[in-house]
């Protein structure tokens, strides 16, 4: 009987919490106080500009002001979290401003929509930010009624400086700045930083993004939620409280089934009674399995709250489509690939596909272990020993150029270790380091070398490879993920009889790859490696090691890199990246999804929000 009482109490508490989340909080965020019109009218009529007294109703007041304003960007909280009426609005053209705030009908063709972009590091200037700002430009271009809210933790930078950086870094200009509202998140920014969580990092960051999303909604609740950075914890409160459409641009899944392969117990069925000497380690392993399983299924649930999922490439799409499966058959749900905008319209301008280039292997990457510079050095050394032993002319031997940046002390240490390895392998005359150079210098390098390297295993996309091909550099890539599936692909579907090269580039694998399977090798001494085919697990594909690939290109079969063939490959590569990775292609596709979100927003208002915005 006592158990029933406990269960009843728990059920009542859970029901009460659900009612608060689904009923009370939406009114807090979306419905202003009953006398809101009088308050705003009073401030408009005041001769001096004063702050509105809105208490904890900041979101609802800011929403109405933003949606009615001729200059929505004025209502940023950069200076402080207080709200005042913009002078352009307080001029109050015969009550037009107040009247505009009352327009709440779902089917009103003039009704404006706030697209909220949740991207805490909006000012960082990386690949994720390029996606963000190209998406912002496309959203604004879709309709004059669209307003964009940027939720950012970069509170040290004012809106103007952020937009100036966007133009300088990504060449994204002509943004309608008046329709971009910056919402600065100051309280909980640290909670999404992986370094903040010394233990249980994944669940900590999920919790942190949930809390940060609450701060975002409390300052300004949007009509559509767009996550362009990969913080799925934000979806929970957005879905439960605001009941609005959610779109997620996924750069990579935060947890994948393959990660369980690292665990001692990969499923409950593998757990056994431990030996006395193994009790401690087994208990820890079981705990780790439970933790990872909990995170995995929570992530799976969060994916069910998303209406439109866009993956940055085939590798991400294949993984996320196998994880976010709960709502696959739901009406209106969509999952697709949308390659990131790489600015190939600009990159391919004046590219030289004719003429000779320097016989160098350029590797552009940050100095981090996962980029596998060390693998390149070891394989290059092996190739060099073979090339010199058979008397290959020095002019036919390519040299290495490592070009990259050091953003952290760890990067600097990696660079130091690589230089030491060059000494140990006696490669000083063959390897050049270019550190922290300018973008202009990078363009010079891309315009003068023949070949570009990429050695990372399962790089989700690989924008560096796109840059190689855009500037006529022939890619030599690790055969995995983005470079294999999306970027270095056969132009114009020209048939090929081998797996390790096509009409745009070359591929290699390595025995150190996590997916290398010794049992598949017919000759363990061979430098041509067998890997399970990505299309048919019962068949295999053959790839050379990097050392063997260099042997093939520069010693055994130099016709593969004759000047005539290289010219053709450059032309194919330029056409390929223009067709798939231009800003224009991204923009057109994003605009389609912006329209879909607008349609979903209407149906959500009618079916899920019960007319709450019409209160007062």
Curated annotation (Swiss-Prot):
Signal peptide: none
One Gene Ontology term from the biological process aspect of the record: dolichol-linked oligosaccharide biosynthetic process
Intramembrane residues: 200-220, 461-481
Membrane topology: Single-pass membrane protein
Lumenal side of membrane: 1
Molecular function per GO: GDP-Man:Man3GlcNAc2-PP-Dol alpha-1,2-mannosyltransferase activity
Broad class of enzyme this protein falls into: transferase
EC number: 2.4.1.131
Subcellular location: Endoplasmic reticulum membrane
Gene3D superfamilies xrefs: Glycogen Phosphorylase B
Pathway: Protein modification; protein glycosylation
Record field: transmembrane: 2-21
Catalytic activity: an alpha-D-Man-(1->3)-[alpha-D-Man-(1->6)]-beta-D-Man-(1->4)-beta-D-GlcNAc-(1->4)-alpha-D-GlcNAc-diphospho-di-trans,poly-cis-dolichol + 2 GDP-alpha-D-mannose = an alpha-D-Man-(1->2)-alpha-D-Man-(1->2)-alpha-D-Man-(1->3)-[alpha-D-Man-(1->6)]-beta-D-Man-(1->4)-beta-D-GlcNAc-(1->4)-alpha-D-GlcNAc-diphospho-di-trans,poly-cis-dolichol + 2 GDP + 2 H(+)
CDD domains with a match to the protein in the record: GT4_ALG11-like
Membrane-side (Cytoplasmic) residue stretches: 22-199, 221-460, 482-616
UniProt key word Glycosyltransferase: yes
Pfam families: ALG11_N (PF15924), Glycos_transf_1 (PF00534)
Similarity comment: Belongs to the glycosyltransferase group 1 family.
Function: GDP-Man:Man(3)GlcNAc(2)-PP-Dol alpha-1,2-mannosyltransferase that operates in the biosynthetic pathway of dolichol-linked oligosaccharides, the glycan precursors employed in protein asparagine (N)-glycosylation. The assembly of dolichol-linked oligosaccharides begins on the cytosolic side of the endoplasmic reticulum membrane and finishes in its lumen. The sequential addition of sugars to dolichol pyrophosphate produces dolichol-linked oligosaccharides containing fourteen sugars, including two GlcNAcs, nine mannoses and three glucoses.
PANTHER family cross-referenced by the UniProt entry: GDP-MAN:MAN(3)GLCNAC(2)-PP-DOL ALPHA-1,2-MANNOSYLTRANSFERASE (PTHR45919:SF1)
Protein name (record): GDP-Man:Man(3)GlcNAc(2)-PP-Dol alpha-1,2-mannosyltransferase
Gene behind the chain: ALG11
């Amino acid at each position: 009987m006592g158990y029933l009482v406990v269960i009843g109490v728990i059920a009542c508490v859970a029901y009460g919490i659900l009612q608060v989340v689904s009923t009370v909080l939406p009114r807090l965020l979306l419905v202003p106080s009953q006398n809101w019109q009088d308050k705003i009218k009073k401030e408009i009529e005041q001769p001096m500009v004063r702050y509105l007294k809105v208490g904890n109703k900041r979101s609802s007041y800011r929403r109405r002001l933003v949606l009615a304003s001729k200059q929505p960007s004025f209502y940023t909280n950069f200076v402080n979290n207080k709200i005042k009426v913009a002078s352009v609005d307080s001029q109050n053209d015969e009550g037009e401003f107040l009247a505009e705030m009352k327009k709440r009908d779902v089917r009103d063709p003039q009704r404006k929509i706030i697209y909220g972009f949740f991207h805490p590091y909006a000012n960082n200037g990386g690949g994720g930010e390029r996606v963000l700002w190209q998406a912002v430009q496309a959203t604004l271009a879709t309709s004059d009624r669209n307003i964009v809210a940027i939720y950012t933790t970069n509170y040290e930078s004012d809106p103007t400086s952020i937009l100036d950086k966007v133009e300088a870094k990504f060449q994204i200009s002509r943004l309608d700045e008046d329709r971009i509202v910056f919402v600065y998140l100051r309280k909980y920014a640290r909670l999404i930083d992986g370094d903040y969580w010394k233990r249980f990092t994944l669940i900590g960051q999920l919790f942190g993004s949930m809390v940060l999303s609450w701060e975002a909604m409390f300052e300004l609740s949007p009509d559509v939620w767009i996550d362009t950075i990969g913080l799925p914890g934000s979806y929970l409160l957005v879905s439960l409280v605001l009941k609005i459409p959610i779109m997620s641009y996924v750069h990579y899944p935060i947890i994948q089934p393959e990660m369980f392969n690292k665990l001692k117990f990969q499923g409950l069925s593998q757990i056994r009674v431990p030996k006395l000497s193994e009790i401690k380690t087994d208990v820890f392993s079981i705990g780790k399995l439970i933790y990872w399983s909990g995170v995995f299924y929570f992530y799976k649930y969060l994916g069910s709250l998303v209406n439109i999922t866009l993956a940055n490439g085939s590798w991400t799409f294949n993984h996320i489509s196998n994880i976010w499966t709960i709502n696959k058959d739901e009406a209106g749900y969509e999952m697709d690939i949308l390659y990131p905008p790489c600015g190939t319209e600009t990159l391919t301008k004046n590219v030289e596909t004719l003429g000779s280039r320097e016989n160098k292997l350029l590797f552009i990457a940050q100095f981090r272990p996962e980029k596998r510079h060390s693998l390149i050095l070891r394989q290059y050394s092996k190739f060099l020993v073979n090339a010199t032993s058979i008397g290959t002319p020095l002019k036919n031997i390519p040299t290495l150029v490592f070009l990259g940046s050091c953003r952290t002390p760890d990067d600097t240490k990696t660079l130091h270790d690589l230089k030491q390895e060059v000494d140990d392998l006696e490669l000083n005359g063959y390897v050049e380091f270019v550190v922290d150079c300018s973008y202009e210098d990078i363009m010079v390098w891309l315009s003068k070398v023949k070949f570009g390297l990429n050695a990372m295993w399962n790089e989700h996309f690989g924008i560096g490879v796109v840059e190689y091909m855009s500037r006529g550099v022939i890619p030599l890539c690790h055969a995995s993920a983005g470079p294999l599936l999306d970027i270095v692909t056969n132009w114009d579907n020209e048939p090929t009889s081998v797996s390790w090269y096509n009409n745009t580039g070359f591929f290699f694998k390595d025995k150190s790859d996590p997916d290398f399977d010794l049992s598949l090798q017919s000759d363990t001494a061979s430098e041509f490696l067998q890997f399970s085919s990505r299309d048919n697990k019962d068949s295999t594909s053959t790839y050379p090691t990097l050392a063997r690939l260099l042997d093939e290109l520069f010693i055994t079969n130099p016709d593969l890199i004759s000047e005539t063939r290289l010219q053709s490959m450059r032309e194919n590569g330029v056409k390929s990246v223009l067709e798939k990775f231009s800003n224009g292609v991204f923009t057109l596709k994003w605009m389609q999804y912006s329209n879909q979100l607008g349609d979903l927003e209407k149906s959500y208002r009618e079916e899920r929000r019960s007319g709450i915005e019409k209160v007062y």
